[in-house]
Structure formats: structure tokens, C-alpha cells
């Protein structure tokens, strides 16, 4: 057994046995349990150990109005990695997107995941249960218009504040899911909001392409003031997190093709982010839009659309007409610009300020 030998320069060297003994001594003094270990990940009342899945609630406390609980799921992957937030149901009758995120709860296996996934499948429970489109019926506010929220505000503002602190501030990436509400006949599309920050924009563009929706709006004028970001994705983007918005489903229907589109897009995006094994399936030649133009009703009446979602229209083309309550035609609605009908009002009911249609204006050069 050689513990020490003399080196060529006259010094002494540790022999292999002594080196082995030293390693053993270090092991005794510093056992593996003393090394940094991955911890449980907790959001609200959901706490998942490594390799586990947990459900719970974000508990929004009572304030000027009632308290509410928002369902939350934490999937803490078996391998280390990034944190991804998947959030839907800000508008509780955009059902296809809600069902898609709910389906992901069971599909995502923590054993396959690198990193952590936080899912909020249904932010606006009151809207969902009472079948009220667009707003939270408790305070009549959209749950995607009051970010970053207020700790002492109304229920929508308090919920937005909690989501910002508990999820947005802790995630690396975020996907915000929406779709066609009760009155919106919508064709699937996504939003990509470049910031001018090369690294962040590169990742968010990779995400939106990996998701696979073939129509993408370039949103360049998202709010950037951290205290008034308004939208969920703007709140995340302004804080340096790569984020996208995806839209699928029309007029509150739950079409399996729309649900599958959102589910498969999420899995592909997770592969692009190296959070799931396998290769993403990015869309290769999407249609890019430089802006959207809303067509707004000037007064009430009964709406008769003449075009469908996804139709390409020329400026001046008739989109539909409006009658009074006696059947008399009182106005015709024409396209103010040329572009694609991303969604069109799906129901006859009409009041002043309603949106007849949303037209996407195609870019001259893809980004």
C-alpha cells in the first residue's frame, strides 16, 4: 500500500491509497445530504415535491368585495429546468382554451418534465359558473385588463395582484390562453410581442413558432410601464419573461380540433424550451399581421354577418348589415381595411360600442 511517494522534483506526492482515503474522509465530513438539493415548489396551497404533481388554490382574500379561490396545479419535474406558467380562463366562457389547459393537467407527467409547470386552468370562476362573457360579474371588470393588480382593489384587481406575485414574478416563460367568447366567431391565431431585447425576443419568437398556430399578430405597442401593464402577457413580458398569447375555439364552443390544437401546441412549445423530450413541430410559413383593426357598432340593432371567420376581405367589402327591431335595414357594415377576419360577431344581439369584427392586416415582410 503506497501512501506517499517522492516525485521527480524531490517533492512528495500522495499515493493512490491516500487519495482514496482523502475522498472517503470528505464523504464522511460532507455527506450527499449536505449538498444543495432541489426543493418542493409551492404556489398558493399547492406544493409539489420533485417528481410530483399537486393541486390547490390561490386564495384571493376578501376586500371591498368577496374572496375567491383560483384553482392551481404545480407539476415539479423529476429533472431540473425552467419554470413555465400556463394560464387560461381569464374570460370564463372561452371554453376551448379552459378545457385544453385542464387536459394538460393529466397529460403532463412529472417524470418526463425538466423544470416546473404552473397551471391556472380557470382564473375567472364567477364568469364560468354564471356563464357571463368578457368580465368578472363580481366587479364587472375583465380579468385580463387590470394587471399588475392591486392588493386593496376589487376582486379582479386583487386576483391580478396575486397572480403577478405568485406566478409571473416566479416563472421564466408564460403562455396565456384565450379563444372565441360567446359572441366571437374566431379562427385560431397567436400574439407575439417583440421588446427590442434580442435574447428575450428570440425565445418568445421560438415559442410562438413552436406552438404552431398559422396566423400570428405582431403586437408592438403592448404597455411597458411596470405599474400599468394591463394585460397578463404584457406584465410577464415587461418583467423580462418570454411570453406568448394563443387563441383557439369559437363562440364558446368546445370543438375537439380546437382543443387538440392548443394541447399539441403547448407540448411542442415545451419541447422547444427543453422541458419535454423530443423535437418541437414549429409552423414553417405562418401569416404574420402588423396590426388588427376593430370594426365598432355605432348603435344597437340586430346584426346579420355576411362573411365568416378566416375570410380575406378587401377594403370596402360588405361584412354584414344591421336592422332595427322591426326588420328595417338601418346600416351596412364595410371593411375599413383589407385583411383577414380573425373574428366576427357571432350573435344577432348588438349595442353601441360592440365589435362587429377584428381584421388582421398582413405584413409586407415577415419578421
Region spans (language model):
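Structured catalytic-domain cores with a bias toward divalent-metal coordination
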Residues: 5, 14-18, 35-367
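Ala/Thr-enriched low-complexity intrinsically disordered regions
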Residues: 8, 20-23
Amino acid at each position: 500500500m503506497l501512501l506517499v511517494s517522492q516525485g521527480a522534483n524531490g517533492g512528495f506526492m500522495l499515493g493512490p491509497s491516500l487519495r482514496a482515503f482523502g475522498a472517503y474522509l470528505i464523504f464522511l465530513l460532507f455527506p450527499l445530504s449536505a449538498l444543495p438539493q432541489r426543493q418542493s415548489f409551492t404556489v398558493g396551497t399547492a406544493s409539489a415535491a420533485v417528481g410530483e404533481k399537486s393541486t390547490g388554490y390561490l386564495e384571493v382574500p376578501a376586500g371591498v368585495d368577496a374572496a375567491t379561490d383560483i384553482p392551481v396545479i404545480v407539476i415539479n419535474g423529476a429533472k431540473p429546468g425552467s419554470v413555465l406558467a400556463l394560464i387560461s380562463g381569464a374570460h370564463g366562457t372561452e371554453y376551448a382554451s379552459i378545457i385544453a389547459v385542464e387536459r394538460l393537467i393529466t397529460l403532463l407527467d412529472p417524470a418526463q418534465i425538466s423544470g416546473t409547470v404552473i397551471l391556472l386552468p380557470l382564473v375567472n370562476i364567477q364568469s364560468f359558473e354564471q356563464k357571463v362573457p368578457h368580465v368578472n360579474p363580481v366587479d364587472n371588470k375583465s380579468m385580463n385588463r387590470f394587471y399588475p393588480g392591486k392588493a386593496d382593489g376589487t376582486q379582479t384587481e386583487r386576483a391580478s395582484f396575486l397572480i403577478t406575485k405568485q406566478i409571473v414574478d416566479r416563472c421564466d416563460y408564460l403562455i396565456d390562453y384565450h379563444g372565441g367568447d360567446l359572441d366571437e366567431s374566431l379562427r385560431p391565431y397567436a400574439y407575439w410581442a417583440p421588446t427590442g431585447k434580442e435574447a428575450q425576443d428570440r425565445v418568445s419568437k421560438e415559442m410562438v413558432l413552436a406552438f404552431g398556430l398559422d396566423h400570428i399578430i405582431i403586437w408592438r405597442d403592448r404597455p411597458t410601464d411596470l405599474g400599468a401593464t394591463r394585460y397578463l402577457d404584457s406584465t410577464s413580458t415587461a418583467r423580462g419573461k418570454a411570453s406568448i398569447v394563443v387563441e383557439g375555439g369559437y363562440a364558446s364552443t368546445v370543438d375537439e380540433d380546437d382543443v387538440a390544437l392548443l394541447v399539441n401546441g403547448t407540448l411542442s412549445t415545451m419541447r422547444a424550451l427543453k422541458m419535454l423530450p423530443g423535437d418541437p413541430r414549429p409552423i414553417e410559413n405562418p401569416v404574420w399581421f402588423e396590426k388588427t383593426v376593430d370594426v365598432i357598432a355605432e348603435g344597437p340593432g340586430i346584426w346579420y354577418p355576411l362573411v365568416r371567420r378566416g375570410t380575406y376581405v378587401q377594403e370596402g367589402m360588405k361584412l354584414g348589415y344591421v336592422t332595427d327591431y322591426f326588420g328595417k335595414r338601418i346600416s351596412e357594415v364595410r371593411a375599413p381595411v383589407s385583411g383577414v377576419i380573425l373574428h366576427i360577431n357571432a350573435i344577432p344581439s348588438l349595442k353601441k360600442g360592440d365589435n362587429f369584427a377584428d381584421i388582421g392586416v398582413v405584413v409586407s415582410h415577415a419578421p
